[in-house]
């Protein structure tokens, strides 16, 4: 057993250790407080150990409390700003908690190593060279040559010069013109097929499924593919909805005159000539009106 001098020394040392007490109106209800005294010369060199109960005041300040009954007791509170409840009874619980946390960390590292995209925030080893590695999810796919011009809604046209190739995905001029040609054929074919279908329906509209089958069996839709710039002009007019209002006419390439075409003939793009300012009828009308106005003005003045 420890001597009485050793017990007294243990209490005095424990009191000296509490140098930062805080003022409070209640006693500290500690779950566990262990005060270990220094070893002495006796056989029992572990010192004096005591445990504080939950309902009794701290033994460290018991003497001070009974000496100063009329004053507010200065109770020590632990300097724990986090307010965590992670208290362990013995070292075995600490070791078990540490092993469990290390196991969870290893499992997360294994998952990140197998599939880096499976977690939102990978470890620092994977984000170290994130700026060098290309993005797999956020990088959009580049459109093929000609797709952007077709999807923009602007009039399509053939390209006579290759694009400035800034990356490997940019194709040459033939790829661009091929896509423009296919789009022009699609627009013209759709316009001609719609007109042929409307004509077949209006000639003998079906009233049941049997008549509809006969109409589809007997209907022949003839699609003519134009050549050169006429194809692009017809495709642009079909895209703008102007192809339906233009009358069916053919273009004689030898003479350049406009001739009336048959129903089965292809419809070419028409270029309307603007009226000349030297038109005799227009100038005659203007002169007659001006003369009439000038004559009326002179009559009123007289």
Curated annotation (Swiss-Prot):
Primary location: virion
Annotated Polar residues bias: 157-170
Species, as recorded: Varicella-zoster virus (strain Dumas) (HHV-3)
Region (Disordered): 1-42, 125-170, 243-302
InterPro entries hit by this protein: Herpes_UL49
Pfam families xrefs: Herpes_UL49_2
Quaternary structure and partners: Interacts with gE (via C-terminus); this interaction is necessary for the recruitment of VP22/ORF9 to the Golgi and its packaging into virions. Interacts with gM (via C-terminus). Interacts with VP16/ORF10; this interaction allows the formation of a tripartite complex composed of VP16/ORF10, VP22/ORF9 and VHS/ORF17. Interacts with the capsid-binding protein ORF44. Interacts with host CGAS.
KW Transmembrane helix (keyword) present: no
Annotated motif Nuclear export signal, positions: 212-224
Biological role: Tegument protein that plays different roles during the time course of infection. Participates in both the accumulation of viral mRNAs and viral protein translation at late time of infection. Modulates the RNase activity of the virion host shutoff protein ORF17 probably to ensure necessary levels of key cellular mRNAs and proteins. Plays a role in microtubule reorganization that occurs after viral infection by stabilizing microtubule network.
Protein name: Tegument protein VP22
Family named by the database record: Belongs to the alphaherpesvirinae VP22 tegument protein family.
Biased composition (Basic and acidic residues): 1-10
Region: Interaction with gE, residue numbers: 154-244
Keywords: Host cytoplasm, Host Golgi apparatus, Host nucleus, Phosphoprotein, Virion, Virion tegument
């Amino acid at each position: 057993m420890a001597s009485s001098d050793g017990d007294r020394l243990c209490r005095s040392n424990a009191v000296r250790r509490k140098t930062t007490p805080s003022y409070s109106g209640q006693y500290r209800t500690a779950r566990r407080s262990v005060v270990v005294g220094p070893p002495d010369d006796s056989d029992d060199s572990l010192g004096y150990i005591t445990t504080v109960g939950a309902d009794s005041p701290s033994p460290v300040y018991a003497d001070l409390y009974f000496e100063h009954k009329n004053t507010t007791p200065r109770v020590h509170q632990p300097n724990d700003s986090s307010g965590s409840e992670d208290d362990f009874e013995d070292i075995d619980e600490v070791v078990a908690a540490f092993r469990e946390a290390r196991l969870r960390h290893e499992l997360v590292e294994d998952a990140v190593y197998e599939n880096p995209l499976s977690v939102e925030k990978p470890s620092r080893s994977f984000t170290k060279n994130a700026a060098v590695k290309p993005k797999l999810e956020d990088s959009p796919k580049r459109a093929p040559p000609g797709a952007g011009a077709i999807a923009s809604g602007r009039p399509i046209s053939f390209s006579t010069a290759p694009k400035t190739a800034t990356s490997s995905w940019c194709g040459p001029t033939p790829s661009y013109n091929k896509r423009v040609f296919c789009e022009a054929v699609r627009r013209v074919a759709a316009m001609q097929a719609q007109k042929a279908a409307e004509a077949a329906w209006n000639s003998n509209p079906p009233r049941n499924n049997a008549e509809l089958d006969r109409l589809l069996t007997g209907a022949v839709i003839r699609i003519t593919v134009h050549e050169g710039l006429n194809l692009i002009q017809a495709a642009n007019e079909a895209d703008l909805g102007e192809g339906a209002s233009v009358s069916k006419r053919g273009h004689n390439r030898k003479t350049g005159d406009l001739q009336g075409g048959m129903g089965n003939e292809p419809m070419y793009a028409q270029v309307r000539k603007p009226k000349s300012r030297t038109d005799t009828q227009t100038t005659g009308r203007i002169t007659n009106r001006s003369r009439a106005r000038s004559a009326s003005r002179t009559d009123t003045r007289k």
